[in-house]
């Protein structure tokens, strides 16, 4: 049976933990088997491509890496929790 995640392709999310904390973007792909997701503009990795007819010199391609699902929160939920914290009275 397939596992259900709180994010799906096309959702706006915020990274709430890890080295990419604070970054946000759109979910491009959910890797269910690995419990990871690719987020637009987050966790960029470089891939070295060898010489070919399309790239006679070879090239370095940059693409999105994956982030674990547990480190993501929906943008709407994140904004709501932020507003709730700001509205709470300060304890004296």
Swiss-Prot record:
Subunit structure: Part of the 50S ribosomal subunit.
A Gene Ontology term for the protein's cellular component: ribosome
Listed name of the protein: Large ribosomal subunit protein uL24
GO process terms (BP): translation
Family according to the record: Belongs to the universal ribosomal protein uL24 family.
Keyword Zinc: no
MF-aspect GO terms: rRNA binding; structural constituent of ribosome
Function recorded in the entry: One of two assembly initiator proteins, it binds directly to the 5'-end of the 23S rRNA, where it nucleates assembly of the 50S subunit. One of the proteins that surrounds the polypeptide exit tunnel on the outside of the subunit.
PANTHER family: MITOCHONDRIAL RIBOSOMAL PROTEIN L24
Source taxon at top rank: Bacteria
Lineage, opening ranks: Bacteria, Pseudomonadati, Verrucomicrobiota, Opitutia, Opitutales
InterPro entries: KOW, Rib_uL2_dom2, Ribosomal_uL24, Ribosomal_uL24_CS, Ribosomal_uL24_KOW, Translation_prot_SH3-like_sf
Pfam families membership: KOW, ribosomal_L24
Organism: Opitutus terrae (strain DSM 11246 / JCM 15787 / PB90-1)
Cited HAMAP family: Ribosomal_uL24_B
Keywords recorded for this protein, A-Z: Ribonucleoprotein, Ribosomal protein, RNA-binding, rRNA-binding
């Amino acid at each position: 049976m397939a596992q259900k995640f709180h994010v799906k392709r096309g959702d706006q999310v915020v990274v709430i933990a890890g080295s990419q904390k604070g970054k946000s973007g759109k979910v491009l792909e959910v890797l269910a088997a690995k419990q990871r997701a690719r987020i637009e503009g987050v966790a960029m990795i470089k891939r070295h491509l060898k010489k070919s007819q399309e790239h006679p010199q070879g090239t370095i391609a940059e693409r999105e890496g994956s982030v674990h699902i547990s480190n993501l929160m929906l943008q709407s939920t994140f904004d709501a929790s932020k507003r709730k914290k700001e509205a709470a009275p300060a304890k004296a």
